[in-house]
Amino acid sequence: MIKPIKILGVPVHPFTMQESVDWLEEKILAKQQTFVVTANAEIIMMCQEDASYNNIISKQADLVLPDGAGAVWAGRHLGYNVPERVAGFDLYCNLLALSAKKGYKAYFFGGSPGIAEAAKAKAETMYPNVNVVGCHNGYFTVADEAGI
């Protein structure tokens, strides 16, 4: 695995889109739960202001990708080879295409009520063979957690 670089102390993996998809496919095949952050400049700056948030991003995320021109520029300005921006939306579209091709499962989680359902419907239109096994908005109770 390519070692992360540090942008204002935040570890960022300088992967290409394809390297990101390949790395995540390895995790899918290993059935390994993985926490991915697509970090733009705002997220990196928020890590400077909020120690709890920084801990989540810097210590708990398995993969932090440069999502945004600011993150790519900062990495390059610091002398690192950051090949490209890996936007979260584009990454998820690539993963949905891969899932449709290889039969992997997808799940939509988060957002206001109705957003995950709309995303599921859109994904099923864009990727007819995708297997979306469920969706849930970002509002839930402790009692809901087991079902999610």
Language-model segments: residues:
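N-terminal nucleotide/polyanion-binding subdomain common to many enzyme families
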Residues: 1-85, 89
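Conserved beta-alpha
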Residues: 75-148
